[in-house]
């Protein structure tokens, strides 16, 4: 598999906009919409992910709400496999299975349809745009495993390494980040 060069990584990083003090003071939000509307960057990223995963015999890509839907659905289409949305509680119309996770001030919950993977033992790739503290990704990984699936890897476009989010996932699955911000 061909890795991205440092020049390619720098190009991708240059297409991501920093938005200071969003959603609250002191946070620098990584806005990927500027990567998405750059056809060269989005194509390069999707080609890289397709190359990485095309030989891994993955059955489904599961994307975390909401930006994980964008990358996950695009990758699933390129791989010719199904896509499963991991949603916030109350957003799916059919019977669901859920997993709770801790927030800074409280608890949140994500869910998938009970029949999302059409049986057990499927090979699943989890994807999201960014890993920060890792709480949502950890809950999504547990949720996938709770349904009897094999979680092949958790993939993130951006890893904010200084927040140590990957520590919560290391015991559950392999982790791959396209871009890392120290």
Curated annotation (Swiss-Prot):
One of its GO terms (cellular component) is cytoplasm. One of its GO terms (molecular function) is AMP binding. Keywords: Cytoplasm, Glycosyltransferase, Purine salvage, Transferase. It comes from the Bacteria. SUPFAM superfamilies: PRTase-like (SSF53271). InterPro entries: Ade_phspho_trans, PRibTrfase_dom, PRTase-like, UPRTase/APRTase. Belongs to the purine/pyrimidine phosphoribosyltransferase family. Catalyzes a salvage reaction resulting in the formation of AMP, that is energically less costly than de novo synthesis. This is Adenine phosphoribosyltransferase. It comes from Nitratiruptor sp. (strain SB155-2).
């Amino acid at each position: 598999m061909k890795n991205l060069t440092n020049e390619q990584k720098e190009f991708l990083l240059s297409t991501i906009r920093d938005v200071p003090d969003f959603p609250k003071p002191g946070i620098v939000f990584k806005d990927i919409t500027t990567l998405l509307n750059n056809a060269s960057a989005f194509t390069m990223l999707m080609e890289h992910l397709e190359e990485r995963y095309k030989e891994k015999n993955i059955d489904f890509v599961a994307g975390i709400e909401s930006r994980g839907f964008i990358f996950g659905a695009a990758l699933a289409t390129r791989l010719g496999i199904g896509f499963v949305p991991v949603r916030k509680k109350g957003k799916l119309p059919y019977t669901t299975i859920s997993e709770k996770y801790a927030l800074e001030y409280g608890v949140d919950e994500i869910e998938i349809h009970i029949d999302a993977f059409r049986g057990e033992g499927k090979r699943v790739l989890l994807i999201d745009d960014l890993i920060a503290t890792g709480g949502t990704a950890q809950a999504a990984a547990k949720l996938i495993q709770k349904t009897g699936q094999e979680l092949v890897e958790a993939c993130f476009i951006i890893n904010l390494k200084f927040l140590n989010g990957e520590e919560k996932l290391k015991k559950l699955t392999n982790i791959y980040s396209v871009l890392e911000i120290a």
